[in-house]
Amino acid sequence: MRRILLSLIAAAVFIGGSAFMGHAQTKMPQMVFRERTLKNGLRVLSVVDKSSPTVAINVWYHVGSKDDPDHRSGFAHLFEHIMFKSTKDMKAEMMDRLTEDVGGENNAFTQDDVTVYYEVVPSNYLETLLWAEAERLSSLTVDEANFKSERAVVQEEYRQSVLAPPNGRLFYALDQKSFVAHPYKRPTIGSIEDLDAATVDDVIKFHNTYYRPDNATLVIVGDFDPKQLDAWVDKYFAVIPKPNLALPRVQVKEPERTAEKRFMEYAPNVPLKGVAFTYLVPSEKNEDSDALEMAAAILSRGRSSRLYQSLVYQQQIAASASARTDLREDAGLFTVLAFVSNGKNPEEVEKSLKAELQKLQDAPVSAAELEKARNQIITSELRNRETDLGKSQTLGEAAVLLGDPNRANTDLPRLLAVTPADIQRVAKKYLKDTNRDVFYYLPESERPKTGTGPVGINAKGGQGR
């Protein structure tokens, strides 16, 4: 639930007043799910919801950009694109016809740890989409033509979605330099050079290694008959063999930080200078993740948040200021970022950011601040659970990334149980000077003449098709 829930919170409009002031009494609807595992290793999770005649289908593959081969960054994302090409019995782009032509939708996204494909269709098309997902798992056409066409698409996406934005290089640098050992430092979207160096044989090997039933979780939420679903899953998925190849997992551990590091990043077309801090934090499974998420919400959710009030409204030294937790399967980052107002300097912004983080360590947050953050979270999750897609992705993330599908039901109560003392404790533990990397993002014109070329590009946050 971590990333999906937090992205919803970021977009939510805070409901003020006393709408959810009794959060302790607010009961989130529980997801009553069924779970089974086929002999070939495919995990199947399902939730019946007959509130509308629709169904959401998700396939979660436990492979992401951290699994890209060395010097082949971008493979997981590239393969997300190739999965929409032809199969033995489907023409290219047929997934669009099977969904959009009946009033549904489909898409996919790649993150550091997973690649996810999903469809939402009228429930009488469930069997068709199950067949289609089994078809592209078992008999995808990976040939030179499909490989080259999708590589070109991804390279153009790289240019348009990352190189073009004025702050793209900053976000790339945050991951690239904040991680020193773990492959999280590689961009999800890859690099032009690595994609150019790739061959179709490389792609086929990647597919054979990771796209297999024992590395997939099928999630179905909506209007269906459970017995009929089981029969269709057996018919289309149970016949797919489990390969004899070993399933590799990343074993690299990111070392602890022992001293503050500083980075000066330069890029063309920088409209506002930036100052960012990253702090290394543990896996999203760690018990401290709840308090870290609440700390980020208190720092930057809404115009009454601490960072906005201090840096943007009162001191007027920043055009924007934010904090976020990027929690992942192996390790994460707590990131604080501000863009400097015209006429102000990065040094004073850095000083003020540090002061606000120190306040979290020095004293517990107020009851009112904590209540506001809780209200935002409840509001967002209630909205999320209104849709089949929202429920299916929450359940899928709990199963694949948190290791327990029931975390979809227990995570929210855990988050709401965070206390001011918990927030103060994790602030002292993780938001300390020795665990901080500092980044300045400056115009290329300010680079010392002995410097190197512009920094790379960003592709984090989940690449979509």
Kindly give the residue locations of the regions a language model identified.
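Positively charged n-region of N-terminal signal peptides that target proteins for export
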Residues: 1-4
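Bacterial N-terminal signal peptides
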Residues: 7-18
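Non-catalytic beta-strand/loop surface segments
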Residues: 20-58, 63-65, 90-125, 161-215, ...
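Active-site SXXK
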Residues: 73-87
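A common structural junction motif
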Residues: 134-142, 236-244, 315, 354-365
